Amino acid sequence: TATTEIYTLSLHDALPISLSDFRGKYVLLDFWASWCPPCRKENPNVVNAFQQYKDKNFTIVGISLDKDKAKWQKAIADDHLTWAHVSDLKYWDSEIPALYGVRGIPANVLLDPNGVIIAKNITGEDLQNTLKEVIK
């Protein structure tokens, strides 16, 4: 198991965010982009997981590989993604996906309350099953 890097990036409303802000919670780092059809198709499943577990010591941080801020913000609103979102709007030149070995999207990383990676690339039913198993 690897401990995650702590980084700071701007939220879509321009507030800085750091992973250390979420210590003590399970955190799903959700790598996606507005221009990615498979990501947008997976979003309802992610929304469902968030609604089901947000009051059980769980949250999501959306990490976008967008380069157009307006399209990114519109996708967040259109897909009802009500958790924290970050992007440096650098597309694949962003350093954060590389930190987690992300080479394609959608992708995600599940961190335990200590910031340790406990699962990667869990989508669909696997996401629900993993959360059900680890979040008691």
Predicted regions and their residues:
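Conserved redox-active cysteine motifs that mediate thiol-disulfide chemistry
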Residues: 23, 31-48
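Structural microenvironment flanking redox-active thiols in thiol-disulfide oxidoreductases
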Residues: 41-79, 91-98
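A short beta-strand-turn-helix
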Residues: 14-27
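Short beta-strand segments
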Residues: 30, 60-64, 86
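Thiol/disulfide oxidoreductase modules built on the thioredoxin-like
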Residues: 81, 88-134
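Short, small-residue-biased leader/transition segments that mark boundaries at the very start
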Residues: 2-15
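Active-site acidic short loop of glycosyltransferases
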Residues: 23-25, 55, 81, 102
